Amino acid sequence: MKTKFFRVGFVRVSLILVLFFSLVSTIQAGALDTFMGEKGTVKISGGTAHIPVMKEAAKRIMTTNSDIQISIAGGGSGVGIKQVGEGLVDIGNSGRKPTDMEIKKYQLKMFKWAIDGVGVVVNPENKVKALSNAQLIDIFSGKIDNWKDLGGLDKSINVYTRDKASGTRDVFWKKAIDKGEITDKANFVVSNGAMKSAISNDPYGIGYVSVGHIDESVAPVALDGVVPTLENVKQGKYKIARGLYSNTKGEPSGLSKKFIEYLFSPEGQQIAADKGFIPIQ
């Protein structure tokens, strides 16, 4: 009797598992089915915060259909907006909303598919992991230039920043340092990845990255008592936040339209969440 009960139970569990995995496969296939039978290329450039999501989405699409080729480059938000506006790429990513002037000049259509924060980071060996907003402004202006003034070692502070084409810099400049001056002694890096690498290799460095890019190689710095985490951004406690945009020149069509629609699909939004961002749906 026990053997019969075990067999029946096993069959029921097996059937449930089969139905579950079939449902998951159907949902995933449904999002990618739109690319079946398509051919062509999609060129993407711009914001570097977007790249992990872009790469994962592109990989899944190209695995589904090898007749589609998707190229992804960084360069920063300003580059993405300019290149899509000039027809050099199909999709230009930006970590800030394009300005009214850019929208008008390039006839841009904007698609915000996730929310991100910009967090201040230091080397994990640095014991200074909390600052006031006023202290941060003074650090980046060069007014405070030694860690000992903040309770750290008697070592010069090495400031790292991004160039003016960066959407990450734009948000940091506006929301973290109140459009204040950035010292001309600052070291420039070209991407979120390069910023992490620089800070992880400099015990006395300080910079800022997309919250979605923060990992064990750098240490987040609390500002006015609030640590830059995904949850704090989501709850509105951490105010240095921004949208992640994919922009097109005019209404998107063809593969560009399908790629953007994929970003808004349940699967695309899950990719965004998996990469450390807040889905909008």
Task: Please provide the spans of the model-predicted regions.
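N-terminal secretory signal peptides that target proteins for export/translocation
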Residues: 1-9
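N-terminal hydrophobic signal/anchor transmembrane helix of membrane proteins
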Residues: 11-14, 126-128
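Bacterial N-terminal signal peptides
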Residues: 12-25
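Exported/periplasmic ABC-transporter solute-binding proteins
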Residues: 29-281
